[in-house]
Amino acid sequence: MIASNSEKHTIVISGAGPAGSMASAFLSREGIPHLLIDKALFPRDKICGDALSGKVFTVLKKLDPDIRSKMGALESDFLPCEGIVFVAPNGKSLDVPFKSKSSNEMAGPAGFVSPRMKFDHYLHNY
């Protein structure tokens, strides 16, 4: 969004990545006027590891307690993931499972893999 010279905003969020989009979503939920700006047009690609662990959902659930199941319903954008496997050049591997702090949090997969373009766009439009 581009603000004209006549528009005044008390809150301006610079950057519509995950942090900026989440801040905007929380402000919108509370009915607090603000402006979210970014130098890029969305959706846009961003280099990233693309993994969303359970720690991400600790924050996302504060916005929407059902967000894990909503993301899980979009399987073409958010692939379920139960952990990570690191493989060394010599072929040795290390499995790192995603774990939940409580069994109540396991209403879906422990995490997701999603291209950053799709994750950012999802949050930006939330």
Predicted features and spans:
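Beta1/beta-strand and adjacent pyrophosphate-binding region of the FAD-binding site
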Residues: 2-19, 35
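Accessory recognition modules or surfaces
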Residues: 4-8, 44, 50
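Conserved N-terminal helical subregion
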Residues: 6, 80-126
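Glycine-rich FAD pyrophosphate-binding loop
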Residues: 12-14, 28-48
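Small-residue (primarily alanine) positions within well-ordered alpha-helices
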Residues: 16-19, 23-24, 28
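Short, well-ordered alpha-helices that flank and scaffold nucleotide-derived cofactor binding pockets
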Residues: 25, 29, 58, 125
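N-terminal FAD cofactor-binding segment of flavoenzymes
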Residues: 45-90
